[in-house]
């Protein structure tokens, strides 16, 4: 019986693509034939891992697998002893493209490889390092958390944030060099790549990876800038304005393109990811776009009805309490909730009414309550219903006895 693909990768069925990719990378490195020569068990594990990743990394295949199991992907995923390698050249390309994506953009040329394509790892060109652009290396994304009050979330807000990040070095204008000059890298001789031959289960391979000296650029700076040590970037403080729309929820995030860390030596900047964190509120509890407020009223107010000022996210409003309002009743104040994230309009404020029970009563107050207790109107209606039900069954018993 074929193993469950999620179990093969050691992830849950709700795992994200990043979690699946991370698990695949770890296992592929662990069981790779280069690290386990002449180990048949490792070879089989390697096949299983690739087969599982081929399916779970593809949205359509994963959906069919979740719905129908192995039968749903039988035509595209490999099966039996052939493992991941019975699926043809297209499936190989998917698998090794993922290898290329995760292992730094490396590519390999095989000698005598039986798969019908030359560049198995699909690196292409001379771009060895992932994230490398025509000028420099792309900057990394920067993630920050932004705490907001419920009032700010209800209406939307613009925040000015002061953050620390990598910025372009002003001394060298981001080139990393005092003069802006560069020279060919001596490690890779300007190619941006280093090569290493190895034998695998597929035959002779030449692994081509990014040069560790120049980061895949092929050139290094001359006369390094002393302010940034030749990187073209340095730590700095910047001010960023963030416009948060109404209706965001805890965990939502906003992506500000190009506002992340600057890229070394002229590389494109990364993105700034602002993760929303909702502060707990002293008075209100959020329920989607509605807010809930607990209101304690005296027993006479519940019985007789009243008008009372109730706090909202937008200030106090007058709320009418109808006579004979029962505890735990929910009264609605339209349009006093949170603005809709997509579309116009706002949610409502729900007021949950509870009775306030005093703890300390005077002798006179106790006597008054005792007198009220004797009246029929203050008897719970459930007791009367019980008596009526008992009377009905007694009558039924009399009829059929």
From Swiss-Prot:
Zn(2+) 1 binds at residues 169, 172, 225, 228. NCBIfam families: DnaJ_bact (TIGR02349), PRK10767.1 (NF008035), PRK14281.1 (NF010874). Zn(2+) 2 binds at residues 185, 188, 211, 214. This is Chaperone protein DnaJ. Disulfide bonds: none annotated. CXXCXGXG motif repeats lie at residues 169-176, 185-192, 211-218, 225-232. It comes from Chlorobium limicola (strain DSM 245 / NBRC 103803 / 6330). It holds the Pfam family DnaJ_CXXCXGXG. GO terms for biological process: chaperone cofactor-dependent protein refolding; DNA replication; protein refolding; response to heat. One of its GO terms (cellular component) is cytoplasm. InterPro entries: DnaJ (IPR012724), DnaJ_C (IPR002939), DnaJ_domain (IPR001623), DnaJ_domain_CS (IPR018253), HSP40/DnaJ_pept-bd (IPR008971), HSP_DnaJ_Cys-rich_dom (IPR001305), HSP_DnaJ_Cys-rich_dom_sf (IPR036410), J_dom_sf (IPR036869).
């Amino acid at each position: 019986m074929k193993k469950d693909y999620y179990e093969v990768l050691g992830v849950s069925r709700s795992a994200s693509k990043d979690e699946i990719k991370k698990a695949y990378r770890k296992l592929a490195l662990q069981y790779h034939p280069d690290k386990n020569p002449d180990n048949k068990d490792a070879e089989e594990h390697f096949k299983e891992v690739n087969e599982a990743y081929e399916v779970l990394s593809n949205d359509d295949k994963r959906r069919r697998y979740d719905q129908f199991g192995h039968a749903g992907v039988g035509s595209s995923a490999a099966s039996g002893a052939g493992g991941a390698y019975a699926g043809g050249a297209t499936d190989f390309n998917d698998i090794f493209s993922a290898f290329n994506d995760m292992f730094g953009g490396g590519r390999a040329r095989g000698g005598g490889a039986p798969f019908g394509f030359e560049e198995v790892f699909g690196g292409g060109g001379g771009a060895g390092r992932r994230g490398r652009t025509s000028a420099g290396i792309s900057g990394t994304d920067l993630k920050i958390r932004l705490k907001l009050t419920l009032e700010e979330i209800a209406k939307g807000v613009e925040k000015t944030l002061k953050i620390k990040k990598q910025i372009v070095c002003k001394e060298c204008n981001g080139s990393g060099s005092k003069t802006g000059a560069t020279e060919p890298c001596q490690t890779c001789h300007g190619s941006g790549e280093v090569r290493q031959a190895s034998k695998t289960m597929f035959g002779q391979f030449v692994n081509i990876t990014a040069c560790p000296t120049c980061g895949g650029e092929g050139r290094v700076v001359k006369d390094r800038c002393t302010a940034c040590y030749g990187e073209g970037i340095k730590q700095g403080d910047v001010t960023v304005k963030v416009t948060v729309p109404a209706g965001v929820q805890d965990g939502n995030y906003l992506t500000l393109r190009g506002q992340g860390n600057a890229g070394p030596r002229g590389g494109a900047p990364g993105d700034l990811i602002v993760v929303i964190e909702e502060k707990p509120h002293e008075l209100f509890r959020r329920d989607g776009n509605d807010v809930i407020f607990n209101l304690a009223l005296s027993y006479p107010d519940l019985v007789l009805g009243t008008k009372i000022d109730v706090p909202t996210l937008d200030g106090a409003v007058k709320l009418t309490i109808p006579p004979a309002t029962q505890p735990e009743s929910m009264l609605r104040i339209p349009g006093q909730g949170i603005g809709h994230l997509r579309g116009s309009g706002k949610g409502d404020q729900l007021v949950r009414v509870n009775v306030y029970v005093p703890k300390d009563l005077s002798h006179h107050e106790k006597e008054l309550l005792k007198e009220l207790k004797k009246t029929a109107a203050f008897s719970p209606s459930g007791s009367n219903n019980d008596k009526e039900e008992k009377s009905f069954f007694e009558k039924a018993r009399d009829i059929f006895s």
